């Protein structure tokens, strides 16, 4: 079956720190030796660096005790032990990544000795945000940095409005900043047409406005910094692989206790980075202590891990099956195009501005003079597929899995009414790779992850150090760039990489995207390739689009980050949603008619399991919360639905492999059902495979057809707001409908 997607020549593997044998041999047993596990130096350091509070609890308890505190600590410890042996999604030292290439045959071998693994160590976003805020609050530290005018500022009616504040000021602050745009602010904005340090700016202000009191000017400048009307070029550090290294280079001529403390922290972090896992406990604790003396934070150190592989090749045949599975999932996805909130905004835009003019972005999104931001929540996507229902009922009646054949695939393709140009231009498919003959006729198989895909290729790899697999990383980055360049040339569209300082400090960890060949819009940071004032919004009959006057082309924003844009600023979200346009996304398999049932059989295409067998457990299935009665009821439910012992418990993006014959595992399940109200149990494949490690695969895919649509003719007319004058007289006439035409002809025309 031919797919509309090509797979990349490269892929990402993600694997846990420990082999599957740890889970199978020790963690499925009723008697787990927690003390021995915690005495293992590698495991101890992994817990220490991942969850410091749990590390403290485990250090201060007797594992033989049966108090509630000890039981809770052991249960949390068990979850982490299971995760570090069964789940590959990157998380500190628990699991890591590596880059691989396609070949004729699959050959993935992960190095067993973790001493060969590589740690990338830097300051955590929680602490880094406090550091930058401190530096921007003390003139001595920012006087030689450049003054940056905040691109978000909207100026109108002699006032400046700013509708967003970053985590550097206050997390989740939703207050609108509004200040008078006086002559001094106008002078500052005009002066910043050229690079200007704060020290030079104060001198210019003093000369221009004849202010002799330098402290008065400094206080005014600090007030602007506190409101983020302006900010410092020190924020460039947030874009760097090693922010602390960048800042220390800037302060190389400083000699005081604070800078010496930063230098010592940096030295200890670089020392810790090259230490073998399991030998860095004392150094890590020393770094935490040094950092906490400067600023208290939720977390202090961010660690990413590169796993070492002996061989890392995925067969081209498997890659081809991934591209076919991606196409099949796209065909089975709901036919909703784009984001529902964007649809509502589009309709309102058409009513107010029409098709024959473009509107300045900042004016459009202003609550004062424009439409403001869409406040509606994204509507849940519904799917009602007769194909899936027929397959479901047939599988249930015959007690079989749901198999989608090539003939089914062809029928779905023939009945498809959505143009392939509405498929994602690029994406990434998440799956787990297994060796074994679980599926007849195949020696290898894939299981598509519950979170199926990303919004664009490159998003998953973005936050990881450029030092990880540098050569292959560069080739992958170039491949992605070439795909978008081809699209740009076909559609007169410029692709821009967008980034911002998030609302929540810890999101700085995943929002970092390293260097890129694309032009950039860095909100709340220096050195953007494009300005917000240059952006305009227009509309066709079916969607909104973004336009740049300078480049005279439409603009498409992408990101190399897995940060959910819903958690970002309203402006960032708007730019991303408009860029996604009328895309039909690759979604997990869901159907309104099937989702209401407690059981769904496995859904498979060839050797790709599109959805594992799934059982849904609700809190109202259990009449008693008393442990023994609850477990008895659970085993009756397990027997009735024929739920296997080896399953994966899933709620949201959280997944945990558990064994239902183990009391400790059932206790975890009970707590989650009572806490969440509902959990899913997914068929687990660890026991059905020959893997010595759980291997997650992230495969970039590209749509073959790059032409997206007929070229849009950009209107030459730019919307200009009518400036009302106070001396105008406004009269509203209310006339009976039957007399309106006569009145207009006789008195108005």
Question: Which sequence ranges carry the predicted segments?
Answer:
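Type-3 copper protein
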Residues: 1-122, 183, 203, 215-507, ...
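Short, positively charged loop/turn segments that connect secondary-structure elements
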Residues: 173, 206-218
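Short acidic, hydrophobic short linear motifs in intrinsically disordered regions
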Residues: 194-205
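Long, low-complexity, charged/polar intrinsically disordered regions in eukaryotic proteins
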Residues: 120-175
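Extracellular/oxidizing-compartment recognition motifs
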Residues: 165-178, 223, 236, 240
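C-terminal structured domains
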Residues: 451-675, 746
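Positively charged, polyanion-binding regions of nucleic-acid-associated proteins
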Residues: 183-193
């Amino acid at each position: 079956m031919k797919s509309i997607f090509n797979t990349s020549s490269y892929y990402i593997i993600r694997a846990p720190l420990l082999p599957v044998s740890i889970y199978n041999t020790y963690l499925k047993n009723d008697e787990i030796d927690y003390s021995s596990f915690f005495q293992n130096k590698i495991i101890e350091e992994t817990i220490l660096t991942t969850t410091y509070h749990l590390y403290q609890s485990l250090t201060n308890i007797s594992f033989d005790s049966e108090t509630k505190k000890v039981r809770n600590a052991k249960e949390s410890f068990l979850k982490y032990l299971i995760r570090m042996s069964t789940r590959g999604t990157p998380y500190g030292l628990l699991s890591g990544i590596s880059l691989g290439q396609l070949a004729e045959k699959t050959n993935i071998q992960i190095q067993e000795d973790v001493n060969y693994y590589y740690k990338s160590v830097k300051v955590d976003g929680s602490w880094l945000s406090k550091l930058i805020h401190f530096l921007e609050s003390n003139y001595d530290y920012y006087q030689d940095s450049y003054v940056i005018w905040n691109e978000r500022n909207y100026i109108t009616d002699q006032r400046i409005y700013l509708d967003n504040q970053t985590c550097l000021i206050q997390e989740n602050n939703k207050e609108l900043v509004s200040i008078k745009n006086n002559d001094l602010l106008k002078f500052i904005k005009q002066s910043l047409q050229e690079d200007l340090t704060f020290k030079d700016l104060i001198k210019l202000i003093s000369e221009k406005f004849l202010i002799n009191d330098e402290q008065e000017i400094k206080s005014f400048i600090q007030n602007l910094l506190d409101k983020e009307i302006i900010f410092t070029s020190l924020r460039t550090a947030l874009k760097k692989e090693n922010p602390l290294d960048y800042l220390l280079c800037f302060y190389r001529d400083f000699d005081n206790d604070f800078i010496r403390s930063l230098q010592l922290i940096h030295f200890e972090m670089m020392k810790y980075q090259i230490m073998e896992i399991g030998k860095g406990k004392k150094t890590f604790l020393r770094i935490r202590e040094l950092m906490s003396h400067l600023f208290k934070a939720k977390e202090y150190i961010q660690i990413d891990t590169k796993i070492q592989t002996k061989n890392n090749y995925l067969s081209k045949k498997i890659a081809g099956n991934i591209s076919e599975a991606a196409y099949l999932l796209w065909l089975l996805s709901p036919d909703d195009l784009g984001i529902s909130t964007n649809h509502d905004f589009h309709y309102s835009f058409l009513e107010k501005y029409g098709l024959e003019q473009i509107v300045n972005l900042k004016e459009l999104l202003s609550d004062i003079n424009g439409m403001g931001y869409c406040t509606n929540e994204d509507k849940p996507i519904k799917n009602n597929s007769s194909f899936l229902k027929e397959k479901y009922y047939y599988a249930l009646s015959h007690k079989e899995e749901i198999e989608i054949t090539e003939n089914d695939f062809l029928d779905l393709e023939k009945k498809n009414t959505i143009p392939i140009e509405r498929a994602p231009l690029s994406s990434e498919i998440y799956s787990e790779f297994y060796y074994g003959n679980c599926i007849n006729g195949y020696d290898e198989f894939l299981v598509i992850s519950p979170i199926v895909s990303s919004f664009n290729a490159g998003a998953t790899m973005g936050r990881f150090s450029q030092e990880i697999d540098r050569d292959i990383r560069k080739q992958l980055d170039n491949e992605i760039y070439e795909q978008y360049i081809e699209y740009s040339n076909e559609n007169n569209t410029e692709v821009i990489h967008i980034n911002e300082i998030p609302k929540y400090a810890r999101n700085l960890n995943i929002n970092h995207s390293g260097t890129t060949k694309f032009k950039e819009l860095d909100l709340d940071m220096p050195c953007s390739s494009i300005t917000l004032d240059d952006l305009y919004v227009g509309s066709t009959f079916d969607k909104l689009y973004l336009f740049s006057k300078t480049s005279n082309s439409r603009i498409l924003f992408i990101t190399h980050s897995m940060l959910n844009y819903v958690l970002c600023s309203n402006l960032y979200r708007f730019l991303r949603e408009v860029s996604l346009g009328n895309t039909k996304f690759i979604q997990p398999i869901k159907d309104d008619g099937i989702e209401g049932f407690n059981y769904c059989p496995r859904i498979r295409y060839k050797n790709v399991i599109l959805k594992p067998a799934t059982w849904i457990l609700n809190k109202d299935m259990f009449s008693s919360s008393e442990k023994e009665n609850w477990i008895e009821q659970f085993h009756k439910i397990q027997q009735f639905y024929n739920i296997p012992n080896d399953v994966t418990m899933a709620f949201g993006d959280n997944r945990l492999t558990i064994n239902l014959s183990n009391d400790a595992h059932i206790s975890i399940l009970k707590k989650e059902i009572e806490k969440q109200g509902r959990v899913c149990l997914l068929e687990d494949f660890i026991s059905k495979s020959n893997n010595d490690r759980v291997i997650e695969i992230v495969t970039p895919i590209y749509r073959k057809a790059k032409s997206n649509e007929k070229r849009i003719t950009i209107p030459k007319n730019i919307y200009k707001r009518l400036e009302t004058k106070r001396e105008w007289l406004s009269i509203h006439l209310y006339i009976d409908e039957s007399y309106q035409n006569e009145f207009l002809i006789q008195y108005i025309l």
